[in-house]
A protein has these predicted regions:
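N-terminal functional module of multi-domain proteins
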Residues: 12-115
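Polar/acidic, low-complexity leader/linker segments enriched in S/T/G and N/D
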Residues: 1-6
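Glycine-centered secondary-structure boundary/capping sites
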Residues: 9, 16, 75, 134-137, ...
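Residues that form generic nucleotide/phosphate-binding pockets
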Residues: 7-10, 146
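Alpha-helical bundle regulatory/interaction domains
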Residues: 80-83, 87-161
Length: 161
């Protein structure tokens, strides 16, 4: 099963094909959206998000050791992690979060969002790919400890808040 299916409860209306990359089109009472999913390598998927809706349901229990990297190109995304914990992404913002961090709600308040999501399943990335990433200075064990184990979300703003 593709990683995006474990994170998003999209109830797709139609799919362009079963081949990859794959585009999933969906809608609800607040609008419509689509995600184009592109597998990158074992344990990594890239999703192009084109949303014109207020909200959609997210899956209740995402997999552990999955990192969700988001970049907002246009629009705004907001989510709440429960009492006293929320975040938002505006145009140009970048976020790295543990996918296991349970969201109590999420929305696109402008009904307009374009961005990308990169999903990394740290348990599925091959030793060869890990060594290539380390060569570029990406330490997946350090990321796992900081993001997944500590259940953190790091946001880099394009402009000061």
């Amino acid at each position: 099963m593709a990683m995006y299916k474990s994170l998003f409860d999209l109830s797709p209306e139609q799919t362009a094909s079963t081949a990859m990359p794959r585009t999933v089109v969906f809608s609800n009472g607040t609008g419509s959206g689509s995600m184009t999913i592109c597998p990158l390598f074992s344990g990594a998927e890239l999703c192009y998000n084109d949303m014109h809706l207020v909200s959609f349901d997210e899956a209740p229990a995402p997999a552990r050791n999955v990192i969700e990297i988001n970049h907002c190109r246009v629009g705004r995304y907001e989510c709440s992690f429960g009492e006293n914990s929320c975040c938002y992404l505006a145009a140009g913002d970048f976020a790295v979060c543990a996918a296991a961090r349970k969201k109590s709600s999420s929305c696109f308040p402008l009904r307009h969002y374009h961005g990308i999501t990169i999903l990394l399943d740290l348990d599925a990335i091959s030793p060869e790919m890990r060594s290539r990433m380390e060569w570029y200075g990406v330490n997946l064990n350090a990321i796992r400890q900081y993001i997944c184990t500590e259940n953190r979300c790091c946001i880099l703003r394009s402009a000061p808040v």
